[in-house]
Curated annotation (Swiss-Prot):
Gene: tyrS
Catalytic activity entry: tRNA(Tyr) + L-tyrosine + ATP = L-tyrosyl-tRNA(Tyr) + AMP + diphosphate + H(+)
Protein name: Tyrosine--tRNA ligase
The family this protein is said to belong to: Belongs to the class-I aminoacyl-tRNA synthetase family. TyrS type 3 subfamily.
Short motif 'KMSKS' region, span: 212-216
GO molecular function: ATP binding; tyrosine-tRNA ligase activity
Biological classification of the source: Archaea, Methanobacteriati, Methanobacteriota, Stenosarchaea group, Halobacteria
Region feature (Disordered): 193-227
Length: 328
């Protein structure tokens, strides 16, 4: 796998293709970042972008993880003391999950977001941005019917973080797309380059296959989950014999979250996936690619129950180091 393939593997979108290709031609010394609100224990959404950071490190990038304590405060996630304590725990979990500690810089937002220059640049961006545009950028991230003034400033800070961190590539889930497009539009107004961005897919709710997996509603997987928790959640997961399920009766689109987690979490981290089965049911199945596993689920060779058993096992292997770190 060459640098371009590793950088773009499992990406839902890159902006722009030409900019990513140029980085792939000479990735050494390039820097990518993801920002995370330190608002809780790592869950499968954090792990999806962390997988991409691991890919980027293997491609030659240096990585910055922004533990966005000021953002979390503006988003009403607790006091600074509480948020910073959570940030320290999250840092340790990211390392336990597999980020290369020697090649990862962890930065608190408050290390630079309270400086005079940053504040003045932020005010300049406020002058360039309508409230409606800021609300649209924030709508995919926050919940609730109304946006507070602090939350409207939030996406402008995300845009400004990119040049202040000195990064070449902004990484986030598809819910960050509007923020990154806002950044491309407004940063040139303060003589900063429009950022290159890479967006990871959104995984559907584990129980229903609808919407997106969320730590605030529905069913998700986190580093607090025991092996038994993981097995229970995965066993109850929605898993039809196809990667492209029919929509619900009321027209909502659905995905197969079991296959999504195999594709975006398991296969990027394991060269081979073994599905254990008793000899009386044909013995073990072994896959060296996601496509092969998907094809055998659709053909009937792989039963959904056996796929779920394997998924729970590999998820537990990924999560166990972080779970052990949390227990210390």
């Amino acid at each position: 796998m060459d640098a371009y393939e590793r950088i773009t593997r499992n990406a839902a979108e890159v902006v722009t293709e030409e900019e990513i290709e140029a980085m792939a031609d000479d990735p050494d010394g390039k820097r990518a970042y993801v920002g995370y609100e330190p608002s809780g224990v790592l869950h499968i959404g954090h792990m999806l972008t962390a997988n991409k950071l691991i890919d980027l490190q293997e491609a030659g990038f240096e990585v910055t993880v922004l533990l966005a304590d000021v953002h979390a405060y503006l988003n009403d996630k607790g006091s600074f003391e509480e948020i910073r304590h959570t940030a320290e725990r999250m840092r340790d979990q990211f390392i336990a999950y597999g980020l290369d500690e020697s090649n990862t810089q962890f930065v608190l937002g408050s290390d630079f977001q309270l400086d005079d220059d940053y504040t003045l640049d932020l005010h300049s961006l406020e002058l360039e941005t309508t409230l409606a545009r800021a609300e649209r950028a924030m709508a995919e991230i926050t919940s609730g019917d109304s946006v507070k003034v602090s939350q409207a400033v939030y996406p402008l800070m995300q845009a400004l973080d990119i040049p202040y961190l000195g990064v070449d590539l902004a990484v986030g889930g598809m819910e960050q797309r509007k923020v990154h497009m806002l950044a491309r539009d407004v940063l040139p107004s303060i003589d900063r380059e429009p950022p290159t961005s890479l967006h990871t897919p959104l995984i559907a709710d584990l129980g229903t296959g609808r919407g997106k997996m969320s730590s605030s509603e529905g069913v998700t997987i986190s580093m607090e989950d025991s092996r038994e928790d993981i097995e229970s959640k995965v066993n109850d997961a929605y898993c039809p014999r196809t990667a492209d399920p029919e929509p619900t009766d009321d027209g909502q689109s659905r995905e197969n979250p079991v296959l999504q987690v195999f594709e975006y979490h398991v296969f990027p981290r394991f060269d081979t996936v073994v599905v254990e089965r008793p000899e009386e049911y044909g013995g073990d199945l072994e896959y060296d690619s996601y496509d092969a596993l998907e094809a055998e689920l659709e053909s009937g060779e792989l039963h959904p129950a056996d796929a779920k058993g394997a998924l729970a096992e590999y998820l537990n292997r990924l999560i166990a180091p972080g779970r052990e770190q949390l227990a210390e």
